Amino acid sequence: MAIAVNRPLMLMILDGFGLGPEGEGNAISQGRLPNYRRLLAGYPHTRLRASGEAVGLPAGQMGNSEVGHLNIGAGRIVYQELTRISKAIRDGSFFSNAALVGAVRAAREHGGALHLMGLVSDGGVHSHLDHLYALLDLAKREGLERVYIHAFLDGRDVPPASAAGYLEQVEDECRQKGIGAIATIMGRYYAMDRDRRWERTARAYRALVAGEGHQASSPSEAIRASYERDITDEFVEPAVITRDGRPLATVREGDSVVFFNFRADRARQLTRAFVDRDFDAFERPGGRLDIQFVCLTQYDVTIPAPVAFPPQVLQNVLGEVIAGAGLKQLRIAETEKYAHVTFFFNGGVEEPFPGEDRLLIPSPKVATYDQKPSMSAREVTDAVLERLDKYDFIVLNFANPDMVGHTGDLAAAIAAVETVDECIGRIVQAMAERRAPLLLTADHGNAEEMREPDGEPHTAHTSNLVPFILVDDRYRGASLREGALEDVAPTVLDILHIQQPAEMTGKSLIVKG
């Protein structure tokens, strides 16, 4: 028999509140949290995976607030770009991708070359070497012979003088596959500027198109020459690899280019130099080239070029399903996490759904939040308590454990989680008076790990599990299974007796007797 539901149902997200070993560096176990511990002792609870493959990230990668809220709100694993592309390589769909295959075939049909340009490192922030190697495989499968790599050097997400090793790896891969050669190298300072320093982008573009730059007979020679001038990877000036005194390859009419960076912000300027018709940031040698240019992901909606992996459109996310049931909902957070309970929770959609109200509580104006660990948690609490009776569903975020956790100040993090616990107590009491259900969870870990093994401050997120507590007297005897963030939305719908849409692949955490 279905359990009657009193309104509102509240989903409370404690940002950066993970489950870690008790110890001196764990602000959560060190803090006085009587309300949180009382809920753990008295109500059904479980643990959720909030990092790595469970939230669409590479295995072992820590979670974050954007990804956490995206998965919670979507009710399914939302694969991030890096993971989506790597998954496509594994399942083979990469090699039938229309945009990528189209670029390779266009080069073949026009008697042109394929140019693969992007960041060559294993930093995993902007690009991935596996994606470059898969593009080489695709070109070989399609029978293309002339394939050239334009290697942008990192030195930021990896050590500052590590490029030689990555270039050797790429050259080894080219030899093993029997396809591809490095034609230019340059630091990301030039090729990946995002601050409208167009003179930098111009130097990168002219090296790629006109062969302008330092000359070297091999990538290793170019790197050596740069290091001798005390210029490390990020700042390596554009260098052109030559054969018999001429550039090995430049981008020409009839060629195809694939920009294999998956992160958008630092790929936009160079892309615009290639594809924009009314480009006026600098003079392009020979004007706009007639080439096939493909972006690996969508760098900007206004860029006129094919995209191999366009943004995912998430249908039937939790907010949409709640709206479709005719229910009123509230999203409330302070400034630091407002986008997370709105844009990210709604699957990357800016517009509210019908019946969805949003309330932003300003975050305090301090340089760092260890100066005010309470942040605006009490103000968020005051505001939500005033509005409990106006809504059917409320999503609330407390930012403190994450934002104060990032400062590395253990005492401040303890004060932060103690403030949140005080607020939990006030909200739980008000919800209990209404016999309304409260679901308490987190998006990723942070405050439970404030010390490195050597005693230094730890300021990053963690890969730890996060709590999930079902606070409702009618479910006191219920059992909950372990799961992942994708299972939160189906649990909300289960309690509200709303049909779970097929697009949600998560499952309710409530074990059916």
From Swiss-Prot:
Metal-binding as UniProt keyword: yes
Keywords: Glycolysis, Isomerase, Manganese, Metal-binding
Annotated positions binding Mn(2+) 1: 402, 406, 461
Active site per the UniProt annotation: 65
Domain of life, source organism: Bacteria
A Pfam family assignment: Metalloenzyme
Catalytic reaction list: (2R)-2-phosphoglycerate = (2R)-3-phosphoglycerate
InterPro entries documented for this protein: Alkaline_phosphatase_core_sf (IPR017850), BPG-indep_PGM_N (IPR011258), Metalloenzyme (IPR006124), PGAM_B_sf (IPR036646), Pgm_bpd_ind (IPR005995)
GO molecular function term, any single one: phosphoglycerate mutase activity
Listed name of the protein: 2,3-bisphosphoglycerate-independent phosphoglycerate mutase
Organism phylogeny: Bacteria, Bacillati, Bacillota, Clostridia, Moorellales
The gene coding this protein: gpmI
